[in-house]
Amino acid sequence: MRVVRCIVALAFTAVFTFSAWPAAMAQAGTGPYLGFDRNEYPGDENLQSLRRIFSYTGYWLNNPPGMKSNNWIGHRSAVEAAGFGFLVLFNGRLYAELKSVSNAQRLGQSDAQAAIKTAQHEGFPRASIIFLDQEQGGRMLPEQKAYLYAWVDAVAVAGFRAGIYCSGIAAKDDGNVVTAEDIRQSAGKRDIVYWAINDACPPAPGCTLPQHAPSLVQSGVSFAEVWQFAQSPQRKDVAGRCSNYNHDGNCYAPGIPGVYIDLNSATSPDPSHGRTQ
């Protein structure tokens, strides 16, 4: 995923060092917890290797950004059987698609129904948190807020919980507005879980497996329950000071050639509460 402003080599590379790997094995007990997400399903054959490192994974309900298909569908049982928790994701609309406040509200409601239908079909339990991927950052315009809140309300009515994946970085070209804070301040009493992106070094550690999953307080969004601190490919305009990405700009899972990932820290080993057992 990639936040745009208005928001995957060899088995072992400089991205992850061998010494960092054992220290970051999937945690038990208290958090925070390391997880990953990626637009393409990593394959059943890689799940056990990834689970030795990560507690949870992203799981798309519709086509991820820039993709014409979604190959995560149908793999929920395999992912849970491997021991993963979930970050359940639905790719939202860009501003150019919204046109007007009334149209944005209609799209938010219809997209929420699509997310709910797929979540149910995939077997996610009621009260699972579905994160809406808000790709564009900065201050949200009226049409964007109309879409977001219509989506959130419809998801909640259906018995699921709503989350939003959005920027946690101050937009210097937009009055230093932080998208997550802007959405929260206008949300009223809506119950929204926030997944904040801040891949700038610092505060992000970059593409590395730290001794412990980084504290979410470091993300700059105090109320975030998930922090994405590295993206593939590296965003040079934001994460240019991070020196530990692979030479091709991606962040690779150790020991799994070709599997590039985004890195996350969360307060729960199952941030969407998507497991059934």
Task: Please annotate each region the language model reported.
Residues M1-C6:
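Positively charged n-region of N-terminal signal peptides that target proteins for export
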Residues I7-S19:
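Bacterial N-terminal signal peptides
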Residues A20-A28:
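Sec-dependent signal peptide cleavage junction
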Residues Q27-P42, L47, E181, Q185-Q277:
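Functionally critical loop-and-helix segments that line ligand-binding/catalytic clefts
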Residues A28-A158:
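Substrate-binding cleft of extracellular glycoside hydrolase catalytic domains
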Residues Y59, V88, I164, W195-A196:
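Structural beta-sheet core signal
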Residues Q144, K172-Q185:
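Active-site-adjacent substructure of cysteine-protease-like catalytic cores
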Residues A158-N176, V226:
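Aromatic-lined carbohydrate-recognition surfaces of secreted/lumenal glycan-active proteins
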